[in-house]
Amino acid sequence: MTEQKNKASLIEFPCAFPLKVMGAVHPEFEQAVLDTVRLHAPDTQAHHITTRPSSKGNYTGATVQVKVENQEQLDNIYRALTSHELVKVVL
């Protein structure tokens, strides 16, 4: 099997995918993450995101439940989030 086929077999689309996002402690972090995800998954609503401070309070963590239709859409969301100035890491 090729690497691409192996990756495709790990996730069955469409699905609800939990994105883990770490970023700056900033009053607009949650809205920035939500707005960025909505560019590629417009059905994502505010109740799909939860945030919490890191243990030392230096970062904010967010989990966003996103309905994704295919790998390309998921990749586009990852790229958009990782390029945002308030985002440090996306898992």
UniProtKB/Swiss-Prot annotation:
Membrane-crossing residue ranges in chain numbering: none
Gene3D superfamilies: 3.30.70.260
UniProt-listed Pfam families: DUF493
Top-level taxon: Bacteria
HAMAP family: UPF0250 (MF_00659)
Family, similarity comment: Belongs to the UPF0250 family.
Protein name in UniProt: UPF0250 protein NGK_1021
Native organism: Neisseria gonorrhoeae (strain NCCP11945)
